[in-house]
């Protein structure tokens, strides 16, 4: 029987990983891999500075990997014929979403899932997110704004009609073909999920996905089990680790009391569907191993893993240092050599970056392999919007070229 906790890596691999985490000045983190031999895991440092160690019971807000769960729930609803990927998204909304530069091209759910909607993350979205996501801890006396208020002047959320490329060429920003990675896409998806299911988003994800494979965690902190430890996301300022999110010193229920009165469709930013899933690294690995093996999810996997956008010189914003060459639905696809990814294509997954935390999860459906990396706080800060972090590259080199090469 395959261990659910995971075996330790061989001493040489553990030593290499320890050296990498130490070299990059990591506060706490983990590496978990899945393959034909089951799970292997590595844990490093602290969940809280000089206090509680980072272990298999440490839960972390995993940033944008969360989008895969939001996308999976929507695709389940597509399979159930509750929704149509290629229908004008306004069919499902209580506000109007039209690109003013291309009013005759309807924005669809498929475009939201593969980031070709031509939406962008505007300042007004960030302002509403802060008022909503951290309402209890930062703005306890403020009411949650209605999500539709964001779209009173909806045109501000779209990219301009044309953009100049890195080589000076003018590129048309056409819905359905131009890729621009945008958090707002998945907030709108989650809003639609709530409107159709008439349940809070966190409940939908729990019932449809996490409970299916008995994975603890969720999109609200109350869903973390009593034996789990929620690690805040940390940034180093000076020589002090500063918690940027999920830093709670009192029981969760005494902070998040208003969640009980939440009305589905009010403002799904409450659950941060683009970034707010809290789960352990082993839990995340277990989820995707179960997902790969689940024959009843075959239609979902087919829809997700099928290529729906490929990069050209003029059809994307070249974000994250040109990391994204291909996209499925709610997932990044790597189908050719890139860093340590050199075989077992395609690799399906996502990166996450938020408040000092760096996460990634990639899996090879054909080889039944996968890798999960959690980095929470590091002394060597990157500048700009880069692709894979140097520490992620170092870790992947050890796993792909030493650990898996021995199989």
Which ranges hold each PLM region?
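Short, surface-exposed loop or secondary-structure junction motifs
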Residues: 101-345
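Short, well-ordered beta-strand elements
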Residues: 358-364, 368-381
